[in-house]
Regions:
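Short, hinge-like loop/turn segments at secondary-structure boundaries
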Residues: 40-43, 81, 103-106, 192-196, ...
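Rossmann-like dinucleotide/flavin-binding elements
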Residues: 72, 149-176, 183, 218-230, ...
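Local beta-strand N-terminus motif with an aromatic residue
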Residues: 20, 83, 233-235, 363-365
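Rossmann-like dinucleotide-binding cores of NAD(P)H-dependent redox enzymes
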Residues: 176-213, 287-342
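Short acidic, glycine/proline-rich loop/turn micro-motifs
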Residues: 34-38, 186-191, 251-252
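A structural motif corresponding to the C-terminal end of an alpha-helix
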Residues: 17-21, 53-61, 206-218, 332-335
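Flavin-dependent oxidoreductase catalytic cores
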Residues: 1-154, 158-162, 166-169, 173-174, ...
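Short, conserved active-site loop motifs that form the nucleotide-linked donor/cofactor pocket
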Residues: 20, 203, 214-216, 235, ...
Length: 409
């Protein structure tokens, strides 16, 4: 329960007496950004309880902010007396028409903010503002193409969906082919770990946008060179076929091996004691996914170890999200071995070197590879290659590259 101390009540009342129009309640600062800009997977409106308490002592409106990324959250906060005004920060950068779409009842057309914080990362280092989900945050203008073309997009992941939509908006005739039964690509797997479910909203939004734009979508359709030569002769071909999880062939002799993607997709079923090779975002999220619930006492829970060769987990991940996940792994009892390199693997043992000392794990059931991705092979002559099959990166990179290319097509 929020303790509205005497000084806080005093300051609020003094501001009201001085003629303030309303009091804005936030939290955190540039050092503790996790409070002012909460990470993905955290609860919405974390300062609402403080706003509600302050509101009880004032006669002017009170506002609050942070993770109010859907209209229903704002409506519920106001209806329940938590606040009078909801401030929309990052979601309004993600979709500048957020409020207008909410007012018009077009909530499904709101581009979803996932709370990743990459919009502000650039600004803090003197770079332009950007957005993972909205590559057009600086300029929404998409000019019609001077020459209308027929365009084939291969791959229904984020890059393929973005390229197909922008090409269609420019007046091209677009066909999008996806070899599986669902759009989304690796984003579907990225949405599986704890706290990442909001990525499903991105897939839903991008799919709905393609359908509304009239893009022809073919699922369960694996494009071949012969198909391009016959059915798609004369088309501009954009290949966004994604990437595949890497495996270390020399370590494949262990009793059970699989990739993190195998686990997240449900194709792989690891044993009780799991060793994850790689402490990047994918490795740590998979460890979190597999590890026991905090304070769970069931003896069948897994024992998870993460082996990372560098001196830090999740290099390149945002500070707030990284901190939350690291703390959760520690509370769950996940063993983390930094500055450690696996030197030898046989059918029953995993040997790694840390600080010059050799360590042996001889009771593991499963070895999981989370050592990155390799671009999917492109077998289409003359195709424009986009997204992860061009260069493996993050979601922001894939969407931005596809947007920039399609805008000039």
């Amino acid at each position: 329960m929020f303790d509205c101390s005497h000084w806080l009540r005093y300051v609020s009342k003094q501001l009201e007496a001085a003629g303030g129009d309303f009091i804005h309640v936030s939290g955190g600062n540039t050092i503790k950004r996790g409070s002012s800009m909460p990470a993905p997977g955290t609860s919405p409106a974390p300062h609402a309880h403080a706003a509600e308490e302050i509101r009880r002592h004032l006669n002017i409106p009170v506002s609050t902010v942070a993770r109010i990324n859907e209209p229903w959250i704002a409506e519920e906060l106001i209806a329940n007396g938590k606040t009078d005004i909801c401030m929309i920060g990052r979601p309004n950068l993600c979709d500048s028409a957020f409020a207008n779409k909410a007012f018009a009842g077009k909530t499904e057309d709101i581009r979803p903010c996932i709370g990743c914080g990459r919009c502000l990362t650039g600004i803090m280092f003197g770079k332009p503002i950007s957005c993972t989900v909205n590559p057009s945050v600086q300029s929404d203008a998409v000019a019609p193409a001077v020459e209308k073309k027929k365009v084939l997009v291969i791959g229904g992941g984020p890059a393929g969906m973005e390229a197909a939509y922008i090409a269609k908006m420019r007046g091209h005739e677009v066909v999008l082919c996806e070899k599986t039964q669902e759009l989304g690509g690796l984003l579907r797997l990225a949405a599986v770990p704890i706290g990442k479910q909001e990525l499903c909203k991105v897939i839903k939004f991008m799919t709905r946008r393609l359908q509304n734009a009239g893009v022809e979508i073919r699922k369960n359709c694996e494009v071949t060179p012969d198909m391009i030569a016959s059915e798609f002769a004369g088309y501009e071909v954009l290949c966004a076929s994604g990437a595949k999880a890497k495996e270390i062939e020399a370590f494949g002799c262990f009793r059970q091996t699989m990739t993190a993607d195998d686990i997240l997709s449900g194709k792989g079923f690891p044993g009780r004691k799991v060793v994850i090779l790689g402490g990047g975002s994918v490795g740590c999220e998979t460890a979190d996914y597999l590890a026991p619930l905090i304070d769970d006492r069931f003896p069948a829970n897994r024992d998870v170890t993460v082996i990372e060769m560098t001196d830090a987990l999740m290099a390149g991940e945002g500070g707030a999200a990284k901190s939350i996940l690291t703390q959760r792994l520690m509370r769950k009892g996940v063993t983390i071995e930094l500055k450690s390199t696996v030197s030898k693997v046989d059918e029953t043992t995993i040997t790694y070197i840390k600080n010059g000392t050799e360590h042996v794990i001889d009771d593991a059931d499963t070895l999981v590879f989370a050592v990155g991705y390799t671009p999917a092979p492109v077998n289409f002559e003359g195709a424009h290659v986009l997204g992860d099959c061009h260069q493996v990166g993050n979601l922001k990179n894939a969407i931005a590259e596809a947007y920039a290319f399609a805008k000039k097509l």
